[in-house]
């Protein structure tokens, strides 16, 4: 309707503006749709370049980005099921409705940053172990052991903080808190503890060179 009204008044001699919260959301959605590909490309490329400077490997930065995206997409899926489909609407005391247009960009930025923080911490420990042993399997095991407690503790703190927002009355705050808690939980318990070590061992021939460069 808003697009129809704007199209109908476009040829008018007078400047006619269409207001209201709905028109704001329409404009914001179009603006985000135009900018998101550029922002995503910038974030992913810069992330891979910085990780490459750390480990001097082509495979490891790509793996790092993919693992982070895995955590973020898991939270995206659950937030849709819970808040749009209403899976936990009674338990969390809210009425199911479409997600606010600002939720996905905010969620991606925060969750991706936290995931990369844990990734860099783990890669640093693995890299240090490789320099001492030059054994990829042992380096992954020792790196996971050295960083595991720190990552788990940091994740537990963040989950506790984000979970507090779930009890908010404002739906956008509730949904962001839930999604971030899920993203951190998935990242710390599944991605960092299982998927990342498995990928490093599976791609050991390609990653081995990078993990051992000064």
Language-model-detected regions and their locations in the chain:
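Membrane-water interface of transmembrane alpha-helices in multipass transporters/channels
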Residues: 57-66, 86-107, 167-181
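Alpha-helical transmembrane segments of integral membrane proteins
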Residues: 40-51, 67, 71, 104-111, ...
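Conserved small/polar residues in nucleotide/adenosyl-binding loops
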Residues: 202-208
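Alpha-helical transmembrane segments of multi-pass inner-membrane proteins
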Residues: 38, 42, 63, 100, ...
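Hydrophobic, glycine/alanine-rich multi-pass transmembrane helices and their short helix-loop junctions
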Residues: 50, 148-201
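Short helical (or helix-break) motifs at transmembrane helix termini and adjacent helical loops
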Residues: 109-129, 151
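Structured non-transmembrane domains adjacent to transmembrane bundles in polytopic membrane proteins
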Residues: 1-89
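Helix-loop junctions and hydrophobic alpha-helical segments within the transmembrane domains
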Residues: 130-152
């Amino acid at each position: 309707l808003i697009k129809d009204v704007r199209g109908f008044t476009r040829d008018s001699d007078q400047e006619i503006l269409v207001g209201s919260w709905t028109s704001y959301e329409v404009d914001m959605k179009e603006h985000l749709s135009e900018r998101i590909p550029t922002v995503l490309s910038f974030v992913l490329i810069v992330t891979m370049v910085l990780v490459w400077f750390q480990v001097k490997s082509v495979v490891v930065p790509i793996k790092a980005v993919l693992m982070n995206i895995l955590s973020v997409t898991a939270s995206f899926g659950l937030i849709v099921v819970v808040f749009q489909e209403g899976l936990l609407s009674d338990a969390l005391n809210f009425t199911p409705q479409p997600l606010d247009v600002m939720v996905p960009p905010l969620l991606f930025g925060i969750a991706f940053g936290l995931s990369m923080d844990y990734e860099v911490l783990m890669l640093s420990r693995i890299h240090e172990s490789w320099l001492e042993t030059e054994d990829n399997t042992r380096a992954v095991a020792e790196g996971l052991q050295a960083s595991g407690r720190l990552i788990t503790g940091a994740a537990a703190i963040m989950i506790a903080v984000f979970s507090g927002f779930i009890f908010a009355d404002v739906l956008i705050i509730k949904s962001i808190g839930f999604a971030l808690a899920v993203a951190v939980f998935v990242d710390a318990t599944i991605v960092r503890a299982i998927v990342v070590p498995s990928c490093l061992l599976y791609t050991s021939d390609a990653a081995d060179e990078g993990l051992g460069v000064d």
